[in-house]
Amino acid sequence: FYRNHKVTSIVEQRPVWSENPPEKEGRMYQVQADGEMFLAPIVINAAGVYADEIHNMICEEKIRIVPRRGEYRLMDKNCGDLVNSTIFQQPSKMGKGILVTPTVHGNLLVGPTAEDIPDKQDVDTTAEGLAKVLNLGSNSVDALDGRQTITSFAGLRAHLVHEAPAEKSDFLIEEAAGHPGFIDVAGIESPGLTSAPAIGEYVARIVENIYPAERKTDFIDSRKGIPSMALATEEEREALIRENPAFANVICRCELVTEGEILEAIHRPVGATTLDGVKRRTRAGMGRCQAGFCSPKTLEILARELQLDPAQITKEGIGSEILVGKNKETAPGEGGAWKKPQAPVGKEALHE
């Protein structure tokens, strides 16, 4: 797994025309990504809002994806029982509209908006968008209280745009014409999350038809979840602590997440390397205080276990570093050591 490697070019390497399948005729794709070069007979383009850029590197027939931003409010768990099922509104050409839904962990989720924007990295929330979420959500559940919002966020849906009305407008899942082994999984809008397992199986069948392979006899078809102290019985908690005392060290008080759970999240295959990675695997930081209490401890554990300087630990990848240095050391852009400001005296002290 090569994380944080931006693909900059894809070149198809193929010999003179042949009736043989790609793996026998030597057809390969050369993928350049942040100084690394990868060769593969099959490329699966599942790049979300960037899927058009990947597709257009190799295909003559171009596609265009417009990022469609959706803003959400996540409400406190004391609102989780306001509804017991998802409440939908009248759908429109932009989507299913503002919904109100209980989450599996007991919160209440309200949203999303739908707004086409030009920037594929713009996941900022807006005052107007969040007000719209609350106002329209209140049409379904009049007891919604904006003061119970514990966090808000925005995501981007990959809206596939075609000039010709007859062209497919979403769920482009197919082998690209004229480019065997290059598979698009693009324009996945609602219900993309629900469809994800079926999409995976469908793409696997496409791959099997292109590149026949034997099924593994020792394939592990299930994954043991990370133990949850919040959901465990008293007996299960005691057993976990006896096996590993780290399960007795509570890191996130809001969601009752322990050091033992965070260690499992870090050291599993394709383990967590960021604060958000830990959060998504364990819920550490997803509670009412939104990591105000646990983030320093989680950062410390990540740095220790990954053998990195704490300043290298990020929230969600490159560019989201949390620390800039240690107190009382040279500050960025300054020539001398940090000095404590002098306390004001005289009239200045009165104004303070």
What are these regions (language model features)?
Residues 121, 258-269, 292-310:
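Iron-sulfur (Fe-S) cluster-binding segments and ferredoxin-like electron-carrier domains
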Residues 2, 44, 183-185:
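Hydrophobic/aromatic beta-strand patches that form the interior of the parallel beta-sheet core
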Residues 294-302, 330-352:
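Short flanking/linker segments adjacent to small metal-binding domains or redox-active Cys/His motifs
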Residues 279-295, 312-338:
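Short Fe-S-cluster ligation motifs
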Residues 10-15, 26-111, 115-126, 135, ...:
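Flavin-dependent oxidoreductases
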Residues 1-9:
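A conserved beta-strand/loop element that lines the FAD pocket in flavoprotein oxidoreductases
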Residues 91, 95-97, 104-105, 116-250, ...:
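C-terminal catalytic lobe of FAD-dependent flavoproteins
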